[in-house]
UniProtKB/Swiss-Prot annotation:
Organism: Danio rerio
One GO MF term attached to the UniProt entry: unfolded protein binding
Biased amino acid composition, Acidic residues: 423-435, 442-453, 560-574
Gene3D superfamilies in the cross-refs: 2.60.40.790
Role played: Required for the quantitative accumulation of H/ACA ribonucleoproteins (RNPs).
Keyword Nucleus in record: yes
Protein name, per record: Protein SHQ1 homolog
GO cellular component: cytoplasm; cytosol; nucleoplasm
Family affiliation: Belongs to the SHQ1 family.
A biological process from GO: protein-RNA complex assembly
Bias (Basic and acidic residues): 506-536
Length: 585
């Protein structure tokens, strides 16, 4: 027989059952309704449900069949109109037979069954008084070497040594008692804690942390009413419903202490899950399986807790040691998120557990944690009382977790960091002051240099001018040493006079001096030019176009370029030959 896919919903008067039976004959089906039991048969499908409320067959039943979709819809009257049936989303629990509500118990104990059922109805005192740990005798240590859901497993890791190191953080759990696991966990957390990573998140990643804190996960949109006293109705996807149908019904015979550990382990796992959802902003990634099992001491160290405060401290410490974002605001907000989920009821918790189950199922070898914890939690949570789930929301909402509870010296580290920041700021301030003083001194020096600059420039110019004049005069003397003495004297005087005029006249008065020099040249031209022409002609025997140095360029030719006769004449007479070229023609 095939168990068909189905969904349950309700209104004030009817229980609505939708069954998917695509391969059946619509004219051949049977329905059985009696008190809490509902049965449906249409070959080859068979469905049996044990309901949380009583139904009745009184003629108001309605049925319809959608041939295209293969959906069979039944409206079954409630015995008490207006009654709310809890847990209609818990498909695994509904499939269990009446009475045992289990296909095959995980642990059978016929004598303790009735007692166990009564204990499940007892109220939990979450402020239970803690007992001081005492070392157990050696002959009783074996009972502590268990782990898994309700400490019902042992010997699992002895068969899975290769996968051990990749799944949990401890070695040889089968031979390690609970107290030693805890000590080793605390020592490891203290050793791997990185103050630098924490300070980077605290001071440099403020924007990223702020965005994560603003993110609103799906459970924040539920707005559960604390006074309602029942679960919020949740919608499960087809994949989630299919996974619930695959679970095998089991009976968990747990004593009061074991059930207490199971509830605290559930809080620990949910905290790790909500942290991953927030830090990935609802988009689980390839690191999600690692993050969830690392943040949960239950999953990574097979830890068993003794109070809600123990769970919160462990979660806070591991949040500061392993994930990418390590910030106290993320820890406190994760606690509020977990409280919101427990306030919404067991259907909301089941949805979270199914998400974790899927993440681990798709990650090798994290699937081992499904076998040890998550699958059992998914089955167990469907059958617990809603009041126990809602009761856990209160201690989470009222939790007072502080940094000093984590025993990682966070406050000392922050104080040291603040002092370092202040010292750095003081150094920067002193450096800025020195820079401004230096800039002020440099500015004064520049002002003084700007005032002295014109005088120095004038002195340099005069010195260069004198050197140039002396060089030109010397060059003329060397070239004209064999020339007419009178011509040399006149040329030297004229050049000296012109250079003197250029030296004495300031830069801003050059235009006036140039005009005066032009007038002098005009005055000199009628007489001196004629005298120079006659003298040169007498010495060289050649007519010169113009010898006025103020108007025409003077070119002194090398005597080696002259004729040999001229050289002889020069040797005999000592006359100078000068050629003046008129560049106008």
């Amino acid at each position: 027989m095939i168990t068909p896919a189905f969904e349950l919903s309700q209104d004030a008067d009817f229980l609505i059952v939708v069954i998917r039976v695509p391969y059946t004959r619509t004219s051949d089906f049977d329905i059985y309704i009696q008190e809490e039991e509902f049965k449906f048969y249409a070959k080859p499908y068979f469905l049996r449900l044990t309901l949380p409320g009583r139904i009745v067959e009184d003629g108001r039943e309605k049925a319809s069949f959608d041939i295209d979709k293969g959906l069979f819809t039944l409206h079954v009257p409630k015995e008490t109109a207006g009654q709310h049936f809890e847990g209609l989303e818990m498909l695994t629990s509904l499939l269990a037979p009446k009475g045992s509500r289990s296909a095959k118990p995980l642990v059978e104990d016929s004598e303790a069954c009735g007692e166990g059922c009564e204990e499940e109805d007892e109220e939990f005192d979450w402020q239970i008084e803690q007992e001081v740990y005492t070392e157990a005798p050696a002959d009783t240590l074996k009972e502590y070497h268990k782990y898994g859901f309700g400490n019902l497993r042992s010997g699992v890791f002895s068969r899975l040594q290769e996968e051990l190191n990749e799944v949990i953080d401890m070695k040889d759990p089968d031979n390690t008692n609970a107290e030693l696991r805890r000590r080793n966990r605390l020592d490891t957390e203290t050793a791997v804690f990185c103050a630098d990573h924490y300070l980077v998140n605290l001071y440099e990643d403020k924007e990223e942390i702020r965005n994560l804190l603003k993110f609103k996960p799906w459970w924040r949109k539920l707005n559960p009413d604390p006074s309602a006293g029942y679960d919020i109705s949740m919608t499960f996807t087809e994949e989630e419903r299919e996974q619930m149908r695959r679970f095998t019904n089991r009976s968990y015979l747990l004593d009061k202490k074991a059930r207490f550990h199971v509830w605290l382990g559930l809080v620990d796992i949910i905290l790790a899950y909500v942290y991953d959802v927030r830090t990935t902003e609802g988009e689980h990634n390839v690191e999600s399986a690692w993050t969830i099992r690392k943040l949960s001491g239950t999953l990574s160290w097979l830890e068993t807790y003794h109070s809600v405060q123990d769970v919160l401290v462990s979660f806070g410490r591991r949040t500061y040691c392993y994930p990418l974002y390590r910030h106290f605001s993320l820890v406190t907000l994760a606690v509020k998120d977990a409280a919101c989920i427990f306030q919404a009821g067991k259907a909301c918790i089941l949805k979270c557990l199914l998400a974790i189950h899927k993440i681990f199922r798709e990650n090798d070898p994290a699937y081992i944690l499904n076998d040890l914890y998550i699958t059992d939690y998914c089955i167990w949570i469907q059958r617990v009382k809603s009041k126990h789930v809602l009761a856990l929301a209160e201690p989470l909402n009222n939790a007072k977790l502080q940094k000093n509870h984590l025993e990682l010296e966070l406050e000392i580290i922050e104080q040291a960091a603040e002092l370092a920041v202040k010292e750095e700021e003081e150094k920067d301030t002193e450096s800025d002051t020195d820079d401004s003083s230096s800039s002020s001194g440099d500015s004064d020096d520049e002002d003084d240099s700007d005032e002295e600059c014109p005088e120095k420039a004038a002195e340099k110019k005069q010195t260069a001018f004198k050197a140039h004049a002396e060089a030109v005069t010397e060059a003329f003397c060397v070239e004209l040493q064999r020339g007419d003495g009178r011509l040399i004297e006149e040329l030297g005087k004229r050049l000296e006079e012109e250079l003197t005029i250029e030296e004495d006249v300031p830069q801003e008065r050059r235009s006036a001096s140039e005009g005066e020099g032009e007038r002098r040249r005009e005055h000199y031209h009628p007489h001196a030019a004629e005298s120079e022409r006659d003298t040169t002609k007498a010495a060289t025997g050649k007519e010169l176009l113009d010898v006025c140095l103020q108007r025409k360029p003077l070119r002194i030719l090398n005597t080696e370029e002259l004729d040999s006769d001229d050289d002889d004449d020069d040797d005999d007479d000592g006359d100078l030959r000068i050629t003046v070229v008129d560049e106008r023609g």
